[in-house]
Design a protein with these regions (language model features):
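N-terminal transmembrane-helix/juxtamembrane module of multi-pass inner/ER membrane proteins
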Residues: 1-71, 114-125
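Membrane-interface helix-boundary signature
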Residues: 2-6, 54-61, 93-97, 158-166
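Membrane-embedded catalytic cores of phosphoryl/pyrophosphoryl-handling enzymes
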Residues: 3-8, 22-24, 126-215
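Lipid-exposed faces of alpha-helical membrane segments in multi-pass integral membrane proteins
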Residues: 15, 71-77, 101, 105-109, ...
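Membrane-interface loops
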Residues: 31-33, 80-160, 164
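Alpha-helical membrane-inserting segments
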Residues: 47, 77, 109, 113, ...
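Membrane-helix interfacial "entry" motifs
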Residues: 54-62, 87, 91, 95, ...
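Alpha-helical transmembrane segments of integral membrane proteins
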Residues: 61-69, 97, 101, 136, ...
Length: 215
């Protein structure tokens, strides 16, 4: 199972790389604001025309992006408390340490795509043309919330409570990803890219976490 998760994660990351490279060469068209170009232009344009732009939904999903940030802070505080209590970083629970390392990897990926822009948003935000690939909100939600489920599953003993928490988090993930697409502030390819990258990283995190657990 540990190897399977790892290989699935690697496969998803390879798909993400292929998808990203394809965006540079397949059906590239200047369909964005200020003549900005994006790959899979025909597909992106069709889906963007269907969804339209809904700034109210953009605002809602933007503010709800604080939820995963609160989760990051919560687990960070938990790790800090354990570190202070045990007076040794390496005595902090393995799953908190691996989670912290995972968050660092996600942050590096985010910074990388902010520096090396693949494409821009289909609309201007406050008159500014912003980087859009991969969707940072999709990444944030899909990289933070699934590991949160894993954390809660290992800590919550009551199966009923555990099930409610899992369903609530999964519903939140679905709402955020779909909401971000329907809001029209990202191209369809941005959402796909964010989902592929996030899924790959989470599967590898899951594998590493299991390996650490059984050491």
């Amino acid at each position: 199972m540990k190897r399977k998760s790892f290989y699935i994660g690697l496969g998803l990351l390879v798909l993400f790389i292929i998808w990203t490279v394809a965006l540079q060469f397949v059906d590239v068209g200047a369909i964005g604001p200020q003549g900005s170009s994006v790959g899979f232009a025909s597909l992106n344009k069709i889906i963007h025309n269907i969804t339209g732009v809904h700034m109210s939904l953009y605002t809602i999903t933007d503010w709800l992006g604080l939820v995963p940030i609160c989760f990051i802070m919560g687990f960070g505080i938990l790790g800090l408390c354990e570190w202070i209590k045990r007076r040794n970083l390496f005595k902090v629970d393995y799953n908190i340490l691996t989670l912290g390392g995972f968050y660092i990897v996600v942050m590096v990926a985010y910074i990388f795509f902010e520096m090396f822009v693949v494409n821009y948003r289909p609309i201007l935000i406050n008159g500014i043309l912003e980087a859009s690939y991969p969707s940072s909100t999709t990444m944030l939600v899909m990289c933070v919330m699934p590991p949160a489920i894993m954390q809660f599953n290992s800590r919550i003993k009551n199966n009923g409570v555990k099930k409610c928490v899992n369903i609530s988090i999964l519903a939140f993930i679905a709402f955020m990803v779909i909401g971000r697409l329907v809001s029209g502030v990202h191209w369809f390819s941005d959402i796909i890219g964010g989902a592929l990258l996030s899924s790959g990283l989470v599967m590898i995190y899951h594998s590493v976490n299991n390996i650490a657990q059984h050491k």
